[in-house]
Regions:
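Short, compositionally biased strand/turn segments
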Residues: 1, 50-60
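Hydrophobic ligand-binding cavity/cleft-lining segments
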Residues: 1-48
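Generic structural detector for well-ordered beta-strands
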Residues: 15-19, 54, 62, 75, ...
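Hydrophobic pocket/interface hotspot
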Residues: 25-29, 61, 76, 87, ...
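Solvent-exposed alpha-helix faces
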Residues: 30-34, 81, 149
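Hydrophobic-ligand binding "helix-grip"
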Residues: 37, 43, 51-52, 66-116, ...
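Short, highly charged C-terminal tails/helix-capping segments
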Residues: 45, 50, 153-156
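A conserved amphipathic terminal alpha-helix motif
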Residues: 125-156
Length: 156
């Protein structure tokens, strides 16, 4: 029996320059994600009040709802402040937490000056999202653009 080969999808890649030193850019992205993450981008039944990235490799990445509930999004794969964080995105192609479905979001922070930092985001292994991976990739491509705009405004 022949297996169907998996078609590799191009990663979503975004780059922006923010008005911040590299340490603050990293901290606001990781430790204050809930302050800029759009409230509409939630997977829980209760309205989103915070997004938490536990500051260590192996830490959790999750949202907290108004009712105190926690909904998993993934895990921290690499924690290298203030230069890099790699997150395991464990939301499947239907935006539900699935520990068996792992795509990766890598964010690199590069100081360009005292108050300027380049932020490079790559969301890869999108073919792992299943049958509707191509459609989800397009949603992520536009979604990450808007999300990073909100992040940049938080730093301005």
């Amino acid at each position: 029996m022949m297996s169907t080969p998996t078609i590799k999808l191009a990663p979503v890649q975004k780059t922006l320059v923010v008005k911040s030193d590299v340490e603050r850019a990293f901290t606001v992205f990781t430790s204050r994600m809930g302050s800029w993450w759009p409230r509409s981008h939630s997977t829980a039944s209760s309205p989103l009040v915070d997004v938490i990235v536990e500051p260590r490799a192996g830490g959790r990445w999750y949202e907290r709802g108004e009712d105190g509930s926690e909904t998993e999004w993934g895990k921290v794969l690499r924690w290298e402040p203030p230069a890099k964080v790699v997150l395991a995105w464990q939301l499947d192609g239907r935006w539900k937490y699935n520990p068996a479905c792992v795509t990766e979001v890598e964010i690199n922070f590069t100081a360009l000056g005292a108050q300027q930092t380049r932020v490079d985001l790559e969301h890869r292994h999108l073919e792992r999202l299943g049958d509707n991976a191509s459609a989800v990739r397009e949603l992520l491509n536009s979604g990450w653009g808007g999300i990073l705009d909100l992040y940049a405004k938080q730093l301005a």
